[in-house]
Design a protein with these regions (language model features):
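C-terminal target-recognition/interaction regions appended to catalytic cores
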Residues: 128-262
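Class I S-adenosyl-L-methionine
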Residues: 1-168
Length: 262
């Protein structure tokens, strides 16, 4: 569900295409992930209609807001996970239990070497390369300490839109650095850009690399992505973190076993 733009944005109707597929395929279980905004003011009507459709098809529907940092992912990432359980399977589903241990940015990418200055991959680590920052963005990132965002920038380094009223316009976490001993912010489809979030490296004067973003999403260090840089960033940022997906999948398998169905 889009937070901005017209209410009739066609992307807001994609959830109903998903419900149509569920109706046609009629699986024992289904999983659906969506942004937290689906339960907000703009998305609430869409969510209620979606849940009604799924229930009418013949499913018991479970919905819960999960934060990936509670499931072994070093990232603050809140998403609604909707689980559908076909009515003949019984009501057995239980969401994965939260983990006691939390991981940090340092745990995940702290051991990676600094990528070359020339923009090439670090030898043996694909996609671990740096983007060249503009002169103004180099000044901005050099001003910031780990964990700080644009609210710590002096006025002369603020973007023009933030100079108007820095308290209400935009996100305070843009033009920021990650903190070593905290989880990362949500890895989005534009995490490769220093201007799009708190995606600066904690110490080095650069945005995080595609490989670092992928690792914060819990992709294996050698996982391959295809397409342009923009395509790969989108593949990484739009994904459900594999480690979280695995736990959800395991919980469904456990549910199926408890059902006694074959």
């Amino acid at each position: 569900v889009q937070r901005r733009g017209a209410d009739e944005d066609p992307r807001n109707q994609l959830v109903f295409k998903y419900a149509q597929l569920v109706d046609e395929l009629y699986p024992r279980y289904f999983v659906m992930e969506n942004v937290s905004g689906i339960a907000g003011k703009r998305g609430k009507t869409i969510l209620e209609e979606l849940l009604d459709k799924l229930k009418n098809i013949g499913y018991t529907v479970h919905i819960k807001l999960l934060d990936a940092q509670n499931y072994g992912v070093a990232q603050r990432r809140k998403r609604y996970i909707i689980i559908g359980e076909r009515s003949d399977m019984g009501v057995n589903y239980e969401y994965p239990k939260e983990m006691e241990k939390h991981y940090t940015v340092r745990d995940v990418i702290g051991s990676l070497p600094e990528p070359p200055e020339d923009g090439s991959d670090y030898p043996g680590i694909s996609l671990h390369r740096r983007d060249r920052l503009s002169e103004i963005n180099l000044k901005r990132i050099r001003t910031l300490k780990p964990g700080q965002g644009r609210e710590y920038l002096p006025k002369e380094l603020l973007a023009d839109c933030h100079k108007i009223d820095s308290s209400v316009i935009g996100y305070r976490n843009v033009y920021g650095r990650m903190a070593w001993d905290e989880v990362s912010p949500t890895i989005t489809a534009r995490f490769d850009s220093f201007t799009r979030g708190k995606f600066g490296h904690p110490e080095q004067d650069r945005s995080i690399s595609l490989r670092e973003g992928a690792m914060l999403q819990t992709f294996p260090k050698d996982f391959l992505f295809t397409g342009s840089k923009v395509d790969m960033a989108r593949q990484i940022g739009n994904a459900v973190p594999p480690l979280l997906a695995k736990q959800i999948g395991t919980s469904i398998i456990d549910c199926y076993k408890r059902s006694g169905k074959s």
